[in-house]
Design a protein with these regions (language model features):
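Sec-dependent N-terminal signal peptides
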Residues: 1-4
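Blade/loop signatures of beta-propeller domains
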Residues: 18-48
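N-terminal, post-signal-peptide region of Sec/Tat-exported proteins
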Residues: 43-59
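Bacterial signal peptide processing site
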Residues: 10-12
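A short beta-strand motif characteristic of beta-propeller blades
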Residues: 47-51, 86-91, 126-131, 172-177, ...
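Short loop/turn segments that connect beta-strands within beta-propeller blades
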Residues: 81-84, 121-124, 167-170, 208-212, ...
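Repeat-blade elements of multi-bladed beta-propeller folds
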Residues: 18-29, 54-77, 91-118, 131, ...
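C-terminal motif of bacterial Sec signal peptides marking the signal peptidase cleavage site
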Residues: 6-8
């Protein structure tokens, strides 16, 4: 499996991340997971470099301070130079990585199938801290300021069905919310006050960032195995019922359902002010009106 670099890009979305043109410290572009890119691509993108790896790269790649970080199915976590693609360091773990890493304050945060979340030094890969959960972690983590603005928090989901908020410096648990089934998708942090994610129990959850208490719960028609996409107070997601759904986060009301053919939607959507864009198992990219579905 190879990692490719085409161009550098950044997000305009507000969050805990430093806004540098070549920085992409959280998968999906920012805390809200809108999937938007703040710069355009050239007409004919050039491949700058390629890195050969020993396993499949399942999770997204992130970038901070000219360092590219990614995990793979062989249990290798790798950091390479953004400009040249040369390896800076590599660490081997006992289990594989499906989750995307996130980077903040010179620290890499990544969940592993060994049931642990790791905080590692960006420049060396050395341990800072780790916590153990009750099942594998396939979802990426998110980064946000605490509601009082005095600290930074990690928000994470796991296959144990638990959404957790942790102190980014120490790993200390701030709160947790338990569901009945595994959670496979990265949680979105919206407007600095909501935590949003879908679960394998068919529900879309909106939690209060401050204490993890549920605010709204939208019932879908099948397991939600992917990450949601948000923009403003709007959220979209796909599921195994072969549908894409759109809802209002403030009211918790389902606004529309979209279906085309009998193929599930397992990819994370991108959302802007007009449309929802999502890839389906039918090998197509679907562009859906955000207003009407």
């Amino acid at each position: 499996m190879m990692a490719l670099l085409l161009v550098g890009c950044h997000s305009d979305e507000k969050g805990a991340q430093k806004k540098d043109r070549d920085d992409w410290p959280v998968a999906r572009g920012g805390a809200g997971l809108s999937g938007q890119v703040g710069v355009g691509l050239p007409p004919k993108p050039d491949i700058k470099w390629m890195v050969q790896t020993e396993g499949a790269i399942v999770g997204e790649t992130v970038v901070s301070k000219d360092i590219v970080v990614f995990g793979n199915s062989a249990g290798l976590l790798t950091a390479v130079d953004l400009k040249s693609g040369k390896k800076k360091w590599q660490r081997e773990f006992e289990q594989s990585f499906e989750a995307a890493p996130a980077i903040f304050d010179d620290t890499i945060f990544i969940g592993c199938e060994d049931m642990k979340l790791y905080a590692l030094e960006l420049k060396t890969g050395k341990d800072k801290w780790s916590i153990e959960t009750d099942d594998k972690i396939t979802a990426g983590v998110n980064l946000t300021k605490s509601p009082d603005g005095k600290a930074y928090w990690i928000v994470m989901n796991g296959y144990d069905g638990v959404c957790r908020a942790l102190d980014a410096k120490s790993g200390k648990e701030i709160w947790k919310h338990e569901t009945e089934q595994p959670i496979n998708g990265t949680p979105a942090v919206v407007n600095g006050k909501w935590v949003v994610f879908g679960g394998c129990d068919h529900f879309l959850y909106t939690l209060n960032l401050a204490d993890g208490k549920p605010l709204t719960k939208v019932e879908g028609e099948a397991p939600i195995v992917s990450t949601v996409g948000t923009e403003g107070s709007f959220v979209a997601w796909g599921d195994h019922s072969n549908k894409v759904m759109g809802a209002d986060l403030a009211s918790g009301e389902l606004e529309w359902k979209y279906s085309d053919r009998k193929f599930p939607f397992m990819a994370a959507p991108a959302v802007d002010k007009k449309n929802v864009y999502i890839g389906g198992r039918d090998k197509k990219i679907h562009a859906i009106s955000r207003e009407s579905g």
